[in-house]
From Swiss-Prot:
Part of the 50S ribosomal subunit. Disulfide bonds: none annotated. PROSITE patterns: RIBOSOMAL_L13. GO terms for cellular component: cytosolic large ribosomal subunit. CDD domains: Ribosomal_L13. SUPFAM superfamilies: Ribosomal protein L13. Keywords: Ribonucleoprotein, Ribosomal protein. The gene is rplM. Belongs to the universal ribosomal protein uL13 family. The keyword Ribosomal protein applies. This is Large ribosomal subunit protein uL13. It comes from Stenotrophomonas maltophilia (strain R551-3). This protein is one of the early assembly proteins of the 50S ribosomal subunit, although it is not seen to bind rRNA by itself. It is important during the early stages of 50S assembly.
């Protein structure tokens, strides 16, 4: 008996709809990253993208515990001297709420070409509207 290895052509990828309203940021994102990698499937293979497509709605209604809204900071550097841009989680949620979930999930995925391929299967939207009705996503309760 030989060890089973999933092939990229034979992997079945489903579409799921996740409502982020009232969910804790970290707990939701760890489960999203797990499902993007495909670790919830019995055919999981580390070097093959076996994960599903995830559509996350209501990203603007995500919840964090403690004082993270003021204390958690996001940094980005333009490359110019003295141009380190910093914003708090509250400011980031106000400006672009979908990017908060995307950043958290991206940090939990592998770095490299396979991780980028997994990340492309995540679709995050601030409100309840999304353009993926044709894919008929199943509602996933996390």
């Amino acid at each position: 008996m030989s060890t089973f290895t999933a092939k990229n052509e034979t992997v079945q990828r489903d579409w799921y709809l996740v409502d982020a309203e009232g969910k804790t940021l970290g707990r939701l994102c760890t489960e999203l990253a797990r499902r993007l990698r495909g670790k919830h499937k019995p055919v999981y293979t580390p070097h093959v993208d076996t994960g599903d497509y995830l559509v996350v709605i209501n990203a603007e209604k995500i919840v964090v515990t403690g004082k993270k809204l003021q204390d958690k900071m996001y940094h980005r550097f333009t490359g110019y001297i003295g141009n380190l841009k910093t914003e708090s989680l509250a400011q980031a949620l106000e400006r672009h709420p979908e990017r908060v979930i995307e950043t958290a999930v991206k940090g939990m995925l592998p770095k490299g070409p396979l991780g980028r391929q997994m990340y492309r299967k995540l679709k995050v939207y601030a409100g309840t509207e999304h353009p993926h009705a044709a894919q008929q996503p199943q509602v996933l309760d996390i």
